[in-house]
Amino acid sequence: MKLSSNHKNPIPTVDIIIELKGGVVLIKRKNLPEGWALPGGFVDYGETLEYAATREAKEETGLDIELIRQFHTYSDPRRDPRHHTITTVYVAKAQGTAIAGDDAKEAGVFQKEALPDKIAFDHKEILNDYFSRRY
């Protein structure tokens, strides 16, 4: 099947639920849309999803992670107001201290009961699915 030059495809992304010190790591975004978010980002050409997840985690939190499992894929075309993205979410564990890097203003570890109010994208839904062990 030949695609025309005006054919648009969704953009692949990864997000990572990093388990650390009894909570999960979130970053406060420097760029729009504002709010707290799971570490993650765009998959670069030639990368595997797993490599992109470990790279994004390191860039945004300074943490070296160990991927535990692929959690779920989220594909609602409205999940990111900038583009139609499809994200594959991983669960990972890490040791050390999360520090804001790359496009993060802050990094923090949050318990289920103390998640921030303003969470970007569909990451509140993802976190709810994770904490309820939906997948």
Q: Which ranges hold each PLM region?
A:
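Conserved hydrophobic "DFG−1" position in protein kinase catalytic cores
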Residues: 18-19, 26, 92, 109
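Conserved Nudix-box catalytic region and its N-terminal flanking loop in Nudix hydrolases
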Residues: 20-59
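A short coil-to-beta-strand element that immediately follows conserved catalytic motifs
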Residues: 63-72
